[in-house]
Amino acid sequence: MPLRRIVISGCSGGGKSTLSLAVAVQCQKQGGNVGFVDCEQALSKELALNMGVDPNKFVVYQPRDGEDAIDMVETMLKSRAFDLVIVDSIAAMTPRAEIDADIEQQHMGLHARLMSKFMRRVYSLVSEANVVLLCLNQVRVNLQSYG
């Protein structure tokens, strides 16, 4: 696998998380350690074990919000303890301001700004740490573009 940044996009339920676990197993078979940032809070530990993931070489972190996820990815990369870091998923990296806000408040562009911050803080570390960053993302339909 090339050592850099990979994004896998697809529809919900399309097998992206399962594919990432298969990649994790292959990384571990080559002696690697895997960090899994579970932004969706949906990782099936049973599925991971059934697929052959070694829990001794597999660290799972479930962030509270998008900023927490970025901090954890950055920490994992700086530690140089991981050969593969998986982010599941970019779409689930909810900005802290959106979580903390009243339901009526509109927060246009927060996710885009968070992703820009993610790129600035994390992408340069990938090359320095000699690690694969595998990000999963969901394809969404923009209903406002029709009609």
Where are these regions (language model features)?
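Short hinge/gating elements
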Residues: 4-10, 102-109, 145
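Structural motif
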Residues: 7, 84-88, 134-135
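Fold-independent oxyanion-binding glycine-rich loops
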Residues: 10-11, 39-40, 89-90, 137-139
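Phosphate-binding/switch region of NTP-binding enzymes
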Residues: 76, 108-147
